[in-house]
Amino acid sequence: MHIYKEQEAEPSTGLMMPEPAPVASPGSGGSGGSGSVGAEKIGSRGKIEIKRIENTTNRQVTFCKRRSGLLKKAYELSVLCDAEVALVVFSSRGRLYEYSNNSVKETIERYKKANSDTSNASTVAEINAQHYQQEAAKLKQQITNLQNSNRTLVGDNITTMNHRELKQLEGRLDKGLGKIRARKNELLCAEIEYMQRRETELQNDNMYLKSKVAESERGLQTVNMMGSASTSEYVQNMIHYDPRNFLQFNIMHQPQYYPEQEDRKAFMSDER
C-alpha cells in the first residue's frame, strides 16, 4: 500500500519537522544556471556548494523537482528493501506533502514507541549507575569511619579529642572490657566444669579397674590355695606307705624282722 498526499498543513498531523535543505546535483539547476538554483561549482573537481536559493521562482522549481525525486527514492527504498517508509515534507508556504507505504500515523506511533523504549532503557541504566555510585560512596564512607574508630580505640587518633570525647571513649572502653571479662569468665567456668566432670569419670574408671584387679588377685589366691592343699594331701598320703612294698604302716610302730629277706639277700650276694 503506497500513499502519496499533497495538501495544506493541518495541525492534526502532530509532527513538525524542519524544512529539508535542497540537495543539488550536477546538471539540475532549473531554468536558470547553476547560480540561479543555489549550486555553484568550486574548484576544478566539480564540487557543489549547497546554499539557500534566493530567487523565489527558482527555489520553488527546485523544490518541486527535488520533492519528486525524494518521493521516488522513498518508494524505491520501500519496494526494493521491504522497508517501512514514511516521508513528511512541508514547503516554505506550509503545504504538506507525505508518502507512506503503510500508514504515516502508524509509522509515527512506531517511531515514538521505539524512541520511548530507547530513552527508558538509557534512563534505567543511568538510574542504576547513579544508585550504585551512591551505594559505593556510602560504603567508602563507612569504611573510613570504621578505620577512624579502630584507630581511636587503640589510642592512635586521640590527639584532637577534647575532655568530653575522651570521657565518652573511656566509658565505651570500660563497657567493652566488662563484656570481655564476663565472656572470659564464662569460658573459664565452662572449662572448669568440663574438667570436673572428666575428673569424676576418671575416678570412676580407676575404681572399676581396682575392683577388677582385686577380683583377679582373689581368684589367683584361691587357685594357689587349692593347688597347695592338693600337694599337702598327696604328701600325707605318701607318708603312710612303705616305699619298698607300698604296704601301709604306722610310723609309731617298728617294722617287724623277716629272716627270709636276709637269706634272700645273702643268696643273691653269693650268686654275684
Curated annotation (Swiss-Prot):
Expressed in the lodicule, stamen carpel and ovule primordia. Residues 129-219 form the K-box domain. Its main location: nucleus. InterPro entries: MADS-box/MEF2_TF (IPR050142), MEF2-like_N (IPR033896), TF_Kbox (IPR002487), TF_MADSbox (IPR002100), TF_MADSbox_sf (IPR036879). Gene3D superfamilies: Transcription factor, MADS-box. Residues 27-36 have a biased composition (Gly residues). Signal peptide: none annotated. Disruption phenotype: Abnormal flowers with floral-like organs. Residues 1-41 are annotated as: Disordered. One of its GO terms (molecular function) is protein dimerization activity. Residues 43-103 form the MADS-box domain. It is found in: Nucleus. GO terms for cellular component: nucleus. One of its GO terms (biological process) is cell differentiation. Keywords: Activator, Developmental protein, Differentiation, DNA-binding, Flowering, Nucleus, Transcription, Transcription regulation. Probable transcription factor involved in the development of floral organs. Acts as a C-class protein in association with MADS3. Involved in the control of lodicule number (whorl 2), stamen specification (whorl 3), floral meristem determinacy and regulation of the carpel morphogenesis (whorl 4). Plays a more predominant role in floral meristem determinacy than MADS3. This is MADS-box transcription factor 58. The gene is MADS58.
